[in-house]
A protein has these predicted regions:
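C-terminal substrate-binding/catalytic lobe of Rossmann-fold NAD(P)-dependent oxidoreductases
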Residues: 1-106
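Generic C-terminus detector
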Residues: 104-140
Length: 140
C-alpha cells in the first residue's frame, strides 16, 4: 500500500490491514485470512458494493489478461474454497467471502487467489501488458 513520491514509495496510512496466507493440500489456490480497519467506519453492504464495483488500472485499460470483474464476493459461509473458486475469471480474479465484524479490527474476511495463474505466470503477463500499454516497453 502506498504511493510514489519523488521516486520513493511512501506507505499508506490507511486502511490498516493484517493478513495471513493459508496453504492447503490442493494443487492450486491460496487462501488469505485478512483483518482491516478504516479511518471512516464502513458497513458490510458498503464494503461488498465497493468490492463488486472495483476496477483497477488493468480493468480500466481493458488489458488482455485482466479479469472482468476482478473481485467476486460470496454470501455463503463456507466460501470461497480453493477447489470451487480458484479458477474465477480464468484464474486471474480474486474471490472474497466470510466478511464479518471483528472485535480488534473493524472487519475480517477470507480471500482466495490462484497461486500460479494469478500469482506467478499470469501476474507476470499482466504486469508486462500494463508496462507495454503505459509505454515502458516499446513496440518493435
Amino acid at each position: 500500500w502506498g504511493h510514489l513520491e519523488n521516486g520513493v514509495i511512501v506507505p499508506a496510512k490507511a486502511p490498516i490491514i493484517s493478513a495471513h496466507c493459508v496453504r492447503v493440500a490442493v494443487a492450486d489456490g491460496h487462501l488469505a485470512t485478512c483483518w482491516a480497519s478504516f479511518e471512516k467506519p464502513a458497513t458490510k453492504e458498503e464494503i461488498i458494493e465497493r468490492w463488486r464495483t472495483f476496477e483497477g488500472l488493468p480493468q480500466k485499460m481493458n488489458l488482455p489478461s485482466a479479469p472482468h470483474p476482478f473481485l467476486q464476493y460470496f454470501e455463503e459461509d463456507n466460501r470461497p474454497q480453493t477447489r470451487l473458486d480458484r479458477d474465477f475469471e480464468r484464474g486471474m480474479g480474486i474471490s472474497l467471502g466470510r466478511l464479518r465484524g471483528d472485535s480488534l479490527f473493524d472487519w475480517r474476511f477470507v480471500g482466495l487467489s490462484h497461486n500460479t495463474l494469478r500469482g506467478a505466470a499470469g501476474g507476470a503477463v499482466l504486469i508486462a501488458e500494463l508496462l507495454c500499454a503505459q509505454g515502458y516497453i516499446p513496440k518493435k
